Amino acid sequence: IGQLSQLNKLAAFATNRLILGGGSNILLTKDYEGIVVHNNLKGIELIKEDDTSVYVKVAAGEVWHDFVMHAIDKAWAGVENLSLIPGRIGASPMQNIGAYGVELKDVFYELEAWDIDKEQVVTFDRNECQFGYRESVFKNTLKNQFIILSVTFRLSKSSEVNVSYGAIQDVLTSMGVISPGIKEVSDAVIAIRSSKLPNPKEIGNAGSFFKNPVVPLNLV
C-alpha cells in the first residue's frame, strides 16, 4: 500500500490478512494463505507547534529509526531514547514500543487508521489506544480490523533529556559527556543496543522478545 486510494480494494479480498511493516518480527515457516498488506505509506509533516511543543505527523511506512534521526536533526526531543528500534512507524503504537525509560505513549498524540470493513479513516487518541506495557487495543480487541496509516507525535522543543536508565549514564560518562543533549543520548542508546544485539539486516535475530516481570508494589 503506497497510496490511500488502494485501501478500498482490501475488503474484497480474503478475510485472512497479514499487515506487514518492515518484517523485523516476522518468521514464516510456510506459505501464508491470505492477503499480505505491505504498508509503504511515506511522509513526515510538521502539522502545528506552540511555544513548547511540535506536532509531527508521520506516515506508517516510514522506518522508525529514520524518524528518530530526523527528529534529532530538527532538535525535537522525546524519541531519542528509542533509537535503533527496528520496524516501521505503523507498528510502534501497536505494542507501545519502549526502551531505556521511555515509551511511545509518552510522546503519542493521535493516530489515523483504516477500518477495513467499514472502509473509512478513524482517528484514535491516546485513551482510545488503551496503551499498556507493550500493549494496545490493536493487539487485542481490534486486532486485524484496522491498518494504521499515520501517527502524530507531540515532541518537545526543550533540551531536557531522560538519562534515568543507568546504562545510559554509564555510557555517557565513558564518552566524557557531562551535559548531554538529545544527540548524545541517542548515541549512547545506539552504543548500548549495538553491544547487545547484532544488526538484524546483517544477522537475522529475534531481538529482545521478553517483557520485564511486573510485581505488586508491596513486594518491591
Please name every model-derived segment.
Residues 1-111, 115-117:
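Anion-binding (especially nucleotide phosphate/pyrophosphate-binding) glycine-rich loop
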Residues 26, 121-220:
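Phosphate/pyrophosphate- and phosphate-bearing ligand-binding catalytic cores of soluble enzymes
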